[in-house]
Amino acid sequence: MFTPPTDPKKSVKVKVSQLCELCHARKAVMKRPKNLQRICKECFFSVFETEIHNTIVSNNLFHRGERIAVGASGGKDSTVLAYVLKLLNDRHDYGVEIVLLSIDEGIVGYRDDSLATVKRNQVQYDLPLEIVSYKDLYNWTMDEIVACAGIRNSCTYCGVFRRQALDRGAAKLGIKHVVTGHNADDMAETVLMNILRGDVARLEKSTSILTQSSGSPIKRSKPFKYSYQKEIVLYAHYKKLDYFSTECSYAPEAFRGTARELMKNLEAIRPSCIIDIIHSGESLKLKPKRAKKAPPPSHMEIRPDGSVSLQNEFIDGNRCERCGYLSSNKICKACMLLEGLEQNRAKIQLEKDSTTEGAAKLSRTLEKLQF
């Protein structure tokens, strides 16, 4: 239960209409986006932290002795997440070990600066940090990918590679739980995106606070599921937290922006629409699919490491034949994208060579001409 913090200092006379609606003692400095409640800074800190604690406890997200990796990008969400989790872990004795896990996508002028923020957070919060790069995992950076495949599909590549990179980074650390800073706005946007795209398969699980791929030992949780983005920004501002606020240079091309604009228009009319959309997503249930017949045992091959290779069908826990990552197909999505990139790079190089050869031939022809 939330209890308004007491102020040891002598109260100052303030108009009743300007008083905090919770403690009725201090001046209100903000209006909460989700319920338009006017509250003071101290009460905001308490209610914000209490709501996140209640979300963690009610969903049984953490277990004593567990090691968790916080996906740290240096942005407002992950910075506040790391700060609040450390605070609540100390205050309520969750008994978990927190590690910062960052992904370096290789975006010059964006990720290099944000990683500098993460490194400062590591010192400020006294937490261990692990950085995993696209270049080390895939031998590509996002800048190289965009130069090769164009900017329009950049978020598709980055989304697939980033999810796999987080899992690989966690596995490297021996951690089976990754915590991300997805907030209520992100969750509502995802619901709208899946509706607009007609993506029924993802719609049902788009509001899950705890997810885990079939056969994967690594689970993911979102303690900020019910926390509004505006409140996260205000918390970071009032707490004077060190975070990186520049948007990714490739983000404007993302389809998510369409859902975000739609939601902003809805929120202007109905402030509670973000939570309403999440609750609607939670209520959605798809009709159960007909169970598929299991493939004959002769189609299975057990590898020395215990993973399963199938010729035709898929069994939960199967691994990509190229990289060993969990996949519902013989070749995982990341490897398929990498194959397309390599083919495109070879094509681009061939075109460059042809252009160079053509220019050289034209130059030799001109040299032979006599005027």
Swiss-Prot record:
User: Where does it live in the cell?
Assistant: Cytoplasm
User: Is Transferase there in the keyword field?
Assistant: yes
Q: In which pathway does it act?
A: tRNA modification; 5-methoxycarbonylmethyl-2-thiouridine-tRNA biosynthesis
Q: Which InterPro entries match?
A: CTU1-like_ATP-bd, CTU1_C, Ncs6/Tuc1/Ctu1, Rossmann-like_a/b/a_fold, TilS/TtcA_N, tRNA_thiolation_TtcA_Ctu1, UPF0021_CS
Question: What biological-process terms (Gene Ontology) are attached?
Answer: protein urmylation; tRNA thio-modification; tRNA wobble position uridine thiolation; tRNA wobble uridine modification
- Which CDD domains does the UniProt entry name for this protein? CTU1-like
Q: Keywords on this record?
A: Cytoplasm, RNA-binding, Transferase, tRNA processing, tRNA-binding
Q: Tell me, what is one Gene Ontology molecular-function annotation carried by this entry?
A: nucleotidyltransferase activity
- The EC number(s) given in the record are 2.7.7.-
Q: Name one Pfam family in it.
A: zn-ribbon_14
The Gene Ontology CC terms held by the record are:
cytosol; cytosolic tRNA wobble base thiouridylase complex; mitochondrion
| Family of the protein in this entry | Belongs to the TtcA family. CTU1/NCS6/ATPBD3 subfamily.
What role is this protein assigned? Plays a central role in 2-thiolation of mcm(5)S(2)U at tRNA wobble positions of tRNA(Lys), tRNA(Glu) and tRNA(Gln). Directly binds tRNAs and probably acts by catalyzing adenylation of tRNAs, an intermediate required for 2-thiolation. It is unclear whether it acts as a sulfurtransferase that transfers sulfur from thiocarboxylated URM1 onto the uridine of tRNAs at wobble position. Prior mcm(5) tRNA modification by the elongator complex is required for 2-thiolation. May also be involved in protein urmylation.
Q: What is the name attached to this protein's record?
A: Cytoplasmic tRNA 2-thiolation protein 1
Origin species, per record, is: Kluyveromyces lactis (strain ATCC 8585 / CBS 2359 / DSM 70799 / NBRC 1267 / NRRL Y-1140 / WM37) (Yeast)
